[in-house]
Amino acid sequence: RKVAQYFFLHSAQADDYVVEMNPGTVQAVAGSPYSLQVCDVPLTMASAVCEKSKQFKLSADYYKGDRSMRESGFDVSFRFGPFGAATHHYAPVCLNSLLYKTEKDLEQISLWLGHGEEAEKWKQRAEARRKLIARYLWNQEQGLFFDYNFQTSRLSTYRYASTFYPLWAGLATAEQAKAVVDNLKVFERPGGLPMSTEESGAQWDLPYGWGNIEMVAIDGLRRYGFNADADR
């Protein structure tokens, strides 16, 4: 209900997530129906004039994004649009950093086992991913890593603590790591690093922080030699 109410009040951000249930509606929907009635309430004692109540449902695309957002572990934030509804349209910094780290780990394991061919395969995959992350997820002007919306072909502008994942994974260049450190002030608060710089009212946005992400940031800073920043 809270999600539907938000989209009713912020129609510009609805992106077809709310569908009016008219005869012949063909757009895929799911979940329970919601009623909306708009009333003109006069300032006098006269009775309110109300439009006919309309039935709406949230679209199937909204629920696909919602389930993807919950699988991401970052539920709920506005990082991937309102209530994470567009999660399935993004290439996230955190997921790609984790995949890079996995590929590098598999390369090392293959070497330990004496599987040179297998090690080379994982090495090439990791390097290809590193280049794509640098190309699509790095914002040179802001000096931070951002998620990429592959549906709109646009880099997000939502500053999120996942920007520290490339440092933790060791895929950031020295210059990129220095730029992220220079922008620590964007995130830093008396209690540590919040999840984002946007106060949306959701669980994983400002002012809330998450211990796991604090450790990712600290380990990432140490990996690139920024021990003083990690210590504070």
What is each stretch, according to the model?
Residues 1, 92-107, 157-170, 208-223:
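Well-ordered alpha-helical segments within folded domains of soluble proteins
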Residues 1-4, 14-15, 110-127, 170-182, ...:
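Structural helix-adjacent loops and short alpha-helical linkers that scaffold large soluble proteins
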Residues 6, 10, 102-109, 125, ...:
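Generic, well-ordered alpha-helical scaffold segments in large soluble proteins
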Residues 9, 14-17:
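Extended, charge-enriched helical/coil interaction regions that scaffold DNA-processing
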Residues 16-91, 128-209:
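Extended glycan-interaction surfaces of carbohydrate-active proteins
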Residues 74-132:
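C-terminal transactivation domains of fungal Zn(2)-Cys(6)
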